[in-house]
Every structure is written in C-alpha cells, then in structure tokens.
Regions:
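Short, flexible helix-loop junctions that flank or precede catalytic/ligand sites
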Residues: 2-339
C-alpha cells in the first residue's frame, strides 16, 4: 500500500462523525478525511493513513487489498459501518456509511403501528423504498427486530453486506452475506424456501431474477421484506413490472396484485441534529390491486389521497409542516423533497 502521514484511529474519526451527525466518511490515503455533514462535505484535521486502511480491512475480515473494489461492513464504537473501498488517483480511497446508531425500534405513532401490523402478516411482499440515505435499511432492521422481539418465527436475511447484526430472541435468525454465504440473492431466496422459513428479508431487489424469486416466495406462504430505489411508492409497482419483458408483464401484474402487501417510500431529513422521516404510503387494497391488474397505476395516487392510512409524498410533507409549525427553514427543506 501507499505510504501516508500519521492520523487518528478509526474510533476517533467515527466518534467525530457521530458528534457532527455525519452520515458518511470519505477517505483518500495521504489526504484529509472528509465528513458528509448536512448537504455538504466538511474537511477534518485527520489524515487517512495506511494504518487506518489496514485497520478497516482487519475489521472487515480481509487480509489484503489489491485492485478490486470492496463492499463490506464492520463495527466501531457500537455503530455498524458499510465499507466501500476503491482505487482512484493512484491510491486507495473509501466511503464509510455510518448506519443509524439509534435503537432499533419502530416509531410509537400511527406509521409505526401500521408497520407492526404489516410485520404480523404471514405472507406477501412488503417494500421499503426511497433514495440513497433515506433510512430504508434501518426501517427494515426495525421491522426484523420487532418480529424477533414479539413473534416465534424463522427469519433469514440476505444482505450485501450484513448491516445490522441480530441475536435470536423469540425468533430464530440466520443472516447471510452475498459472496460469503450465497452466490446470488435469487439463490438465497430459493434456498430459504427449503429451510422452513417464515420471513425472508432481501437487502435490495436489484434485478429480474431476484424479484422473480421474491414474488414466488411471497406467493408460497412467506413474508418477504425488501428495499428498492424509487422516489415514490407507486413507482415501485412500475419498476417491478418494467423489469420483465412485455410478454410476461400481464402475468407479473397479476402476481404483484395478489402478493403485494404495501410499499413504504420514505425520505430522511436532518433538522437540528435530529432526523425527520416522511413517508409515502401505499397499501394494496382491492381497489389498488385492480388498478395494477388493469394497467392503471397512475390512478393509484387518487386512492392514496382519499383512503387513510395511505398518503402521498405531498400529503406527508403537509403533515410535517403542520407538526413542526412555523419553522420556515424546515418548510423550505420539505418543499425541496417535491422538486
């Protein structure tokens, strides 16, 4: 590895990131370390060194680093960290995402109660969507923790990498990592069907093969929970259908209309060192299922607007404005979510 200047330990850097409510740590060997703070990057007094990189690799269980990029996870200061290392500018660089270090617990409000009810389902597909950094993984982890605390279930998680570690409580939990324990997400789902599994958590539905396996699992009596990268709840329905060729889409529409439980699409806003979550909520009622089957997804929004507890992103923004009163800067931040 390249030689670099001296720096502080990973613990010191992570503690600084936590103190500043930063979400990401940016590394380039021999250069100052940057923290993602709000909407911008802030340079720190710390410098990235080979010792720091080697410590991160050791925590990830990796003996050496050559040319390939690395996606792993490790722990530091009681926080799980998603690690991405890569080469740029002829040296080693990295981005460390600090996964939410709050206690895993569903909110004590109507949305939290809705998620609890969805977690109690015995089958079907529950999607948590949103852009990068919107807290999708944390929400899914809270759902898994709720099931683990309250129900006797066999839970299998399929992740890349494992982000939140669970110890069995009322439930039996097996966590599998892509590359280490399974060859692909779709293989992991198919394996889970032969392992007397009740709940399957898929880190992300990225491709047709994974979605196909997830829909089959949801059809055959398993609760499947997964994330997708979409900006709106209704867009998740369109995204799933669009992953299949035209001649399969009618069959897939029927499948989705039968197994989909809900789509929760969320945004995470930072305000006064706290996080505000706003959620676009879509439940698969009979009316919604009929619109999915008959290729009328654009009309789903009108159902969201009139049938509680469903809501659109616009409604979620209005609710947040009412909740937080006359804080104009926050209102501006909320309005930006609609642009």
């Amino acid at each position: 590895m390249d030689s670099c200047c001296n720096s502080e330990s990973l613990e010191t850097i992570v503690e600084e990131a936590i103190h500043l409510s930063s979400t990401d740590i940016h590394l380039q060997c021999g250069e100052p370390i940057y923290l993602r703070h709000g909407d911008g990057l802030k340079a720190t007094q710390f410098v990235c060194t080979t010792t720091l990189i080697e410590d991160i690799l050791r925590r990830c269980g990796i003996a050496s680093y050559e040319w390939q990029s690395i996606d792993e996870a490790c722990s530091c200061c009681g926080v799980r960290i998603r690690v991405h290392l890569y080469r740029a500018n002829q040296t080693i660089c990295g981005t460390l995402r600090l996964l939410c270090h709050q206690q895993l617990k569903l909110d004590d409000n109507s949305e939290g109660q809705l998620l609890q009810k969805l977690c109690e389902s015995h089958d079907g597909l529950l999607l948590v969507c949103g852009p990068t950094g919107s807290g999708k993984s944390f929400t899914l982890a809270c759902c898994i923790d709720y099931i683990n605390q309250t129900m006797e279930r066999h839970i299998i998680t399929l992740e890349d990498p494992i982000e939140f570690e669970f110890k069995p409580k009322k439930s039996l939990i097996h966590q599998r990592q892509l590359g280490a324990d399974i060859k692909s997400m779709s293989d992991g789902i198919r394996d889970a069907l032969r392992e007397d599994t009740d709940v399957i958590m898929v880190g992300e539905l990225r491709d047709r093969e994974t979605l196909e396996a997830a829909l089959h699992a949801a059809e055959t009596g398993h609760l499947v929970m997964a994330t997708m990268h979409t900006q709106r709840a209704v867009m998740a329905v369109h995204r799933m259908i669009s992953l299949f060729p035209g001649e399969q889409q009618e069959e897939v529409r029927n499948q989705i209309s039968q197994v989909l439980r809900a789509v929760i699409c969320q945004r995470l806003l930072r305000w006064n060192k706290k996080f505000i979550t706003i959620r676009d909520i879509l439940l698969n009622t009979h009316a919604v299922a009929n619109l999915i089957r008959t290729r009328k997804e654009p009309q789903i929004i009108s159902i969201q607007e009139t049938q509680l507890p469903m809501k659109t992103l616009e409604m979620a923004v209005r609710d947040a404005k009412v909740q937080y009163g006359s804080q104009q800067q926050l209102h501006t931040l909320l309005d930006q979510q609609l642009s």
